[in-house]
Amino acid sequence: MSSREELGVAVAGLGAIGKALANRLARNEVAGCRLSAVSGRDPGRTADFIASLPRPVPAVPLHELPRHADIVVECAPAAVLPQIVEPVLDAGKKVIVLSVGALLEFPELFRKAGSSDGQILVPTGALLGLDAVTAAAEGRIESVKMVSRKPPIGFKGAPILAERNLDIDGLTEPLLLYSGSARAAARGFPANLNVAVALSLAGIGPDETQLEVWADPGVVRNTHTIEVVSDAALLRMTIENIPSENPKTGRITAQSVMAMLRKMSAPVRVGT
């Protein structure tokens, strides 16, 4: 029998991804991990969701999650990221961040992580080949470029649309929404481009990572094409993700968190 202690996992945010994660954890689908708490914006809906689980867990405010868990998974709107991450780091625990783009808007979180016993974890998510990019970064990376294409509905509400007075309703051909650095893109598409920021953090940084963003009525899946030129390898990758209930993100995002949690409690770990 294994002597490893079971890890308590709390889920912050009960949107499509948060609910999917909480459901799977509550059903003991990750050996060595259990759902220990949740936090949702609407008390009534949160209570209804908890009632649907095979066993009840407490619903607590964001800042109390570290008291109930070893690991907190952030699945919330980007604006509340500090409210989730700071208490976890102060408690010396781990937080898995899905709103990766928001990390660039709150650089103090990097500093706090560096001065605490806690840790910020960024899952692979939709980014095929993230391990290869981090390995390439141990040498010299010359350039990183990503081209993202999503159905227009996936960009609804993106701040850059209002800033540039862009109308994507009724598009009949691809429209270039943005071309530039990953850092600036994260501001314009806070709910859409976490994959680009994760790529930049793994490689040469958000200012040097180049990005094109297209609203494309001809695609039905979120599609990312990546090219990394380094002294160790030339990497070319294309990923087509099936959207989740939230068209801004892919179904594989929740599965990536499950895989990360599984690695953390597994006797054998595969991958960087």
Curated annotation (Swiss-Prot):
EC number: 1.4.1.21
Superkingdom of this protein's organism: Bacteria
Top enzyme category: oxidoreductase
GO BP terms: NAD biosynthetic process
Positions of the catalytic residues: H224
Binding site for NAD(+): A126, N194
Keywords recorded for this protein, A-Z: NAD, NADP, Oxidoreductase, Pyridine nucleotide biosynthesis
Pathway: Cofactor biosynthesis; NAD(+) biosynthesis; iminoaspartate from L-aspartate (dehydrogenase route): step 1/1
A Pfam family the protein falls into: NAD_binding_3
The keyword NAD appears for this protein: yes
InterPro entries with a match to the protein in the record: Asp/hSer_DH_NAD-bd, Asp_DH, Asp_DH_prok, L-Asp_DH, NAD(P)-bd_dom_sf
Annotated catalysed reactions: L-aspartate + NADP(+) + H2O = oxaloacetate + NH4(+) + NADPH + H(+); L-aspartate + NAD(+) + H2O = oxaloacetate + NH4(+) + NADH + H(+)
Molecular function (Gene Ontology), one example: aspartate dehydrogenase activity
Protein family membership: Belongs to the L-aspartate dehydrogenase family.
Functional summary from the UniProt entry: Specifically catalyzes the NAD or NADP-dependent dehydrogenation of L-aspartate to iminoaspartate.
HAMAP family: NadX (MF_01265)
Misc. remarks from the entry: The iminoaspartate product is unstable in aqueous solution and can decompose to oxaloacetate and ammonia.
PANTHER family associated with the record: ASPARTATE DEHYDROGENASE DOMAIN-CONTAINING PROTEIN (PTHR31873:SF6), L-ASPARTATE DEHYDROGENASE-RELATED (PTHR31873)
Protein name: L-aspartate dehydrogenase 3
Origin species: Bordetella bronchiseptica (strain ATCC BAA-588 / NCTC 13252 / RB50)
Gene designation per UniProt: nadX3
